[in-house]
Amino acid sequence: MKSLSFMFATLVLAGCQSVTHPPLTMAKQVDLPRFMGDWYVIANIPTFIEKGAHNAVESYRLDTDGSIDTTFTFRADAFDGKLKRHNPRGFVIEGTGNAQWGMRFIWPFKSDYRIMYLNADYTQTIIGREKRDYVWIMARSPSIADAEYQQLVALLHSEDYDVSKLQRVPQQW
């Protein structure tokens, strides 16, 4: 619980920074039922709890009330490291084409969560934040072609992300 509280405090303090970027580009429309399921984290600018993550997977399930039950699991520091699990809840922000959510780690606060990019076949996505402090490149499979990865990195660079902070997340299944 301490680490969850610290992560929340970090996200809140990060939200206090002044914004000097243009608005973050988001996916035009997200079909929520199609977006649900498992997403492997290919790379990220990690939060403090994700540093050293291996086999990171974010799983989404649409609840009957319209909220999104989220499970984030990974192994700490190695493929055989301690299994870590976090269960934030997502809330779609109306008028965003389902591309912007508030992600609640601790009630009543919600963190910014934006689906910046989603390919047509729903196999690759980028989740970002307006502050450009954290980002997640995710896919339906544990790996993607290097050329595809470089295209996603270029997209992040065009959105004013500091891509030098981007870290590949080891996946071995």
Predicted features along the sequence, with ranges:
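Positively charged n-region of N-terminal signal peptides that target proteins for export
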Residues: 1-5
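A beta-rich soluble binding module of mature secreted/lumenal proteins
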Residues: 16-173
